[in-house]
């Protein structure tokens, strides 16, 4: 017992307390404790090969620490949870998985080939076949991911199953042009509220001069806009000529009567 106690005491004496040392100073042959030394290091801006390797290693370690911290925060928020994947699963790619699926589903393998083909690729393909439904449900395309997305978080990016029902919710019907009788095909209007049919005939025949009438001739205008205004252009021109003659005669007779009345009053 005494010898064991002595050996334990000697080991405790030999093993000093671990204090980190400056790696840049060690590269140049100096030993200096790291605590409070980073600001005053003489080789903090050294660009030698060893110091560049040390700087690269420090950047990689800092990135790993930041990634672990981010994963821990996501786990606390419930966004994702880590899963354990084997090495063969992480090495198999999706293209190889698709080829192995077709080869396995094409036909039953022969006994010789089944006994001879026990390769890690086939093992990886089998494991990936077992994982393929879960990965297809999550929508992942890369099997090297070590995070499994939560269902509530992933549903934000899934299309809604009622898209076909709600897609036409606010799609109104297009405006329908009026038919020959001036009504829409989906409306049944009483005869007293029906519009006249001269709009379609007027627009199709181009009777632009029929609506330009003097204010002293209301009868030709009513005749031009009646329901029987679907005549030819020659008839409308004849009506316009007659209207002009009647208007001129009425204006002349009106002026003569006015002049005669004025002359009689002066006499």
From Swiss-Prot:
SUPFAM superfamilies for this protein: Cysteine-rich DNA binding domain, (DM domain)
Gene Ontology terms for molecular function: DNA-binding transcription factor activity, RNA polymerase II-specific; metal ion binding; RNA polymerase II cis-regulatory region sequence-specific DNA binding
Residue numbers spanned by region Disordered: 102-137, 246-267
Location relative to the cell: Nucleus
Superkingdom of the source species: Eukaryota
Expression sites (tissue/organ): Expressed in developing germ cells of both testis and ovary.
GO biological process, one term: sex differentiation
DNA-binding interval(s): 22-69
Compositionally biased intervals (Polar residues): 122-135
UniProt similarity note: Belongs to the DMRT family.
PANTHER family: DOUBLESEX AND MAB-3 RELATED TRANSCRIPTION FACTOR DMRT, DOUBLESEX- AND MAB-3-RELATED TRANSCRIPTION FACTOR 1
Function in brief: Transcription factor that plays a key role in sex determination and differentiation by controlling gonad development and germ cell proliferation. Acts both as a transcription repressor and activator.
Protein name: Doublesex- and mab-3-related transcription factor 1
